[in-house]
Amino acid sequence: MIGSAASDAVDAGQGLPSRPLAQCRPADWRAVDGVMTDVDDTLTRDGAIEPAALQALHALREAGIPVIAITGRPHGWSVPFATDWPLDALVAENGAVALIPDGRGGVATEFAQDEVTRRHNARRLQEVAAQVLREVPGAALAEDSPGRLTD
C-alpha cells in the first residue's frame, strides 16, 4: 500500500509504512507486483480522470508495473476507461466482468460466470423487477442499466 495518502498508514500484508507515490524511491517499486485501484472518486472527480492520476498511471506503465482498475460501473460505461487509460485490465460490474485492452483500441471481455448462469440470473432479475414494480407503489428501475452485461 505504498500509495496511501496517510503517511502513518501501514500495509496490512507487509507491515511497511505507506506513503504517497510521489515520495517513493525507485527501490520501493521493486517490491510491487502490481497496483489495483478504484475508479470513481479515486482516479476520477466528477466522472473525469484527474491529471495527476493519469500521470501516475503512465508512470506505472513506464515502470512495468501492471495496473488493474476496478469499478461497479456497467461494461459499456467502462470501455472508454479500459481503452483510453494505460491499464492492463479493468474489472467492471462489481467484479462480474473484466475488460482487457487488446492494444488496437478495443477490449476483450471475460466473465466471472458462464453464459448459462448469466442468462439464468438475468431472467430471475427481470422476474423480481417486474414483481417489485407491480407490488411496490412508486417503485422505478435504476437508469444505469444500459451497457450492463451481468446482474
Residue ranges of predicted features:
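Non-catalytic pre-domain segments flanking phosphatase-related domains
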Residues: 1-37
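Intrinsically disordered, low-complexity segments used for protein-protein interactions
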Residues: 19, 145-146
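Conserved PLP phosphate-binding loop immediately N-terminal to the Schiff-base lysine helix
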Residues: 46
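Active-site phosphate-binding/coordination module
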Residues: 49-145
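A generic structural motif
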Residues: 150-151
